[in-house]
């Protein structure tokens, strides 16, 4: 039986004492994560050296001497000495260090499965967060209870009804938030089937062009806020390091980055929700976003569009509502191929927005690409 899990991010309203406690708990989580990363590397190196020596001398490996790292062993090791070496850890919830190490273990699992890069150390001011298991907090009305702290006000009620699984407390744009995961008592109401299909060509001048001829404009939040962003960045760089004025400038800059991110995500949520509601099958390109942003002339515009976030939202919403997502390979010539006869126009450039094929069909570049994507998408990302 499928589990229906939803997350709700709610802004918190801590007083100065509570905000200071959040910062301390985040510091404990960060210290634990970074210590565990070094310990993981040390154990892995020692284990590898022992195996290499056994192989070099032709000696059988003694399993009792193996020291392959795991998050469970490292958590146990930290517990053995944290009371003496890190007594300040006892002032915050036990989940802060323990779940941080569990998250490191998950990061290594994803790395070895080829799903993500090698884990990096967490940075202060960038990765200010800690997690809580469901037995370590409770929610009542517009308040959340934090261990060793008490009740903290929230700006809204929890949206979902069901079993609360976990929470993550994090700082973004100078504000504190709680991301709460809930397993729903019953599945959400699904969008009705429409029997319609659509191909989507993502672009830079507009967010997306659909195979039915619709053009979805971009909100371009970064472009609209770029002048203000540059001014705040310049102001921050001129402030003396370690000064209160520099910290204030950093907060202003961080809040603007957060505002831009929220505007972009909100626009993408509206677009992806509408697409999943209207179409039963959606075909997209498997874009190499990392490679695309290497183009200095287009990198800012591509980042402003949020292609990765668009795809992520589209996939999880399609799964929720039983819709299908198909994709074509990143090297498929969707723009150069005539959607009518299949002929390739090798001379097509980015500047050419329209063109006529030898079969006398006049194409709009992006609409033609979207039609080809719908016709030739064959890789299932989400199946009904």
How would you describe each model-predicted region?
Residues 1-384:
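Nucleic-acid substrate recognition interfaces
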